[in-house]
């Protein structure tokens, strides 16, 4: 944990629960980050781990008035419940209530993809667009849909769970029980796994990206990921017709090595119309945490986030 400074007024905690790590930050009313940190996710005891983090943050910051929680999977935001999150081994967990009990302050839960979209819409690359699609690509893949300036969660709170949509039917198995899912081929975890499976070397996505063009396996794995993403984005573009596509999450750090071939592939698939603009998320890998902090401010009764400038 790193501490920048203390605060005298109200503060808000944003906690981003991922399949690999849990990241958090404390933000004050003007949007200054006071404290931030991370620790590896203990998938066998996520609820207890998050409650412990919240308790420590509340103890260290008496001005804490709200906690925003975000995680992947099927999330009932109204009830603050993780209905099902395959990568976290959670099913039917009332996470917001657990954190409220641990901290003594209001807590709210949101899907991590929608939280990143919320942050990009208010503070980042989505500003000025009434409709956009935000796709964070990390351990998993999801999308946030901003339609008519409103985030769309769907009839069963599962809008945007594209990571578990079969993109290559009958393909490689996914942890969700299906086969050929987008996450299997195009998530950061999936890219690293497929390379390791083919070569016996676990080198990670950054090394795979650097090896494009010189390592035939890295090139094939990367090109397959780009094609899978383009197929998914083609389906979504033709369904909801957004004006902008924002790529975020850890894989977005690849920059034009990812975005340039993705633009080209998407344009080749949309044969009868122009493709939407594809841009990199301006908040980078911290977009989810900023969304969680906005959620914390809202549950704490504040609209101060409207003035934040990350």
Q: Which residues fall in each region the model found?
A:
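ATP-binding/phosphotransfer module of carbohydrate and carboxylate kinases, centering on a glycine-rich
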Residues: 1-66, 76-79, 97-107, 119-129, ...
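A short acidic Gly-Thr/Ser loop motif
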Residues: 16-20, 136-140, 158
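Short beta-strand scaffold segments in enzyme catalytic cores
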Residues: 22-26, 141-146
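Short hydrophobic alpha-helix segments
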Residues: 37-39, 86, 155
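A short acidic/small-residue loop/turn micro-motif
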Residues: 40-43, 90, 158-161
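A charged helix-plus-loop insertion that forms the helical arch/lid used to bind
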Residues: 80-91
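Short loop/edge segments at beta-strand edges and connector loops
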Residues: 109-113
């Amino acid at each position: 944990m790193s501490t920048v400074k203390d605060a005298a007024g109200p503060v808000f905690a944003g906690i981003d629960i991922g399949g690999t790590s849990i990241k958090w930050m404390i933000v004050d009313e003007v949007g200054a980050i006071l404290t931030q940190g991370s620790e590896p996710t203990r998938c066998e005891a996520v609820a207890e781990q998050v409650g412990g983090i919240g308790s420590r943050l509340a103890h260290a910051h008496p001005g804490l008035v709200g906690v925003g929680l975000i995680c992947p999977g099927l999330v009932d935001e109204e009830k603050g419940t993780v209905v099902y999150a395959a990568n976290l081994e959670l099913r039917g967990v009332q996470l917001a209530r657990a954190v409220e009990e641990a901290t003594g302050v209001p807590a709210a839960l949101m899907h991590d993809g929608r939280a990143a979209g919320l942050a990009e819409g208010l503070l980042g690359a989505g500003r000025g667009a009434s409709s956009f699609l935000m796709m964070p690509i990390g351990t998993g893949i999801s999308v946030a849909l901003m339609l008519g300036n409103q985030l769309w969660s769907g009839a069963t709170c599962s809008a945007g769970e594209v990571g578990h949509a079969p993109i290559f039917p009958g393909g490689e198995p996914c942890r969700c029980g299906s086969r050929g899912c987008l996450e299997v081929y195009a998530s950061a975890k999936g890219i690293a796994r497929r390379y390791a499976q083919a070569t016996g070397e676990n080198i990670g996505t950054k090394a795979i990206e650097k090896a494009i063009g010189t390592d035939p396996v890295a090139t094939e794995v990367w090109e397959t990921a780009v094609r899978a993403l383009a197929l998914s984005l083609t389906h979504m573009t033709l369904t909801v017709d957004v004006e902008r596509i924002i790529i975020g999450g850890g894989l977005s750090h690849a920059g034009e090595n990812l975005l340039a071939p993705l633009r080209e592939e998407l344009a080749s698939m949309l044969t009868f119309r122009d493709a939407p603009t594809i841009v990199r998320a301006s908040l980078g890998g911290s977009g989810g945490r900023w969304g969680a902090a906005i959620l914390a401010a809202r549950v704490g009764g504040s609209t101060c986030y409207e003035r934040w400038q990350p």
